[in-house]
A protein has these predicted regions:
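Bulky hydrophobic segments
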Residues: 1-140, 144
Length: 144
């Protein structure tokens, strides 16, 4: 039996593959490109982690795939950004939380087992700064 996160990850990939095929049959070029790009993006974190030697939990991979599905597939292909005024806010909130957690883990891994221990406020500040920086870069990408 597969864990729920593995099922979610496979379901998202299957949905994107089917949608890309349907868009190809209908001749909707932009939808084909976006769904195939989203499908490729769901595989990149695991590929990157294996090359670097990290082990990412299935739940983390499923969360990334869910975010890619929400931003690219639902947001762009199904125009959720235009249909729901709060869609962009919800995705920015989710990405800020995710990048904050990622920043915390990166800083925690840097200082773990080292003789230089970072105080908790410094770890929190660096995590916050990473989340804000990535959010600012995302806004630049979004409006460019």
């Amino acid at each position: 039996m597969f864990p729920a996160s593995a099922i979610v990850l496979r379901a998202i990939r299957l949905l994107l593959a089917i949608e890309a095929g349907v868009a190809m049959i209908r001749g909707v070029g932009p939808a084909v490109f976006v769904t195939l790009a989203a499908l490729v993006l769901t595989f990149l974190p695991a590929l990157f982690a294996s090359r670097v030697g990290l082990r990412l939990p299935q739940s983390f991979l499923a969360a990334i795939a869910l975010f890619v599905l929400a931003t690219l597939y639902l947001g762009e292909v199904h125009a959720f950004y235009d249909r729901f005024w709060w869609w962009d806010l919800a995705l920015h909130f989710g990405s800020a939380m995710g990048f904050g957690i990622l920043g915390f883990l990166l800083v925690f891994m840097l200082f773990q087992g080292d003789r230089y221990a970072a105080p908790p406020w410094a770890v929190g500040a660096l995590s916050f700064c990473l989340a804000v920086t990535v959010g600012a870069l995302w806004e630049i990408f979004e409006y460019a």
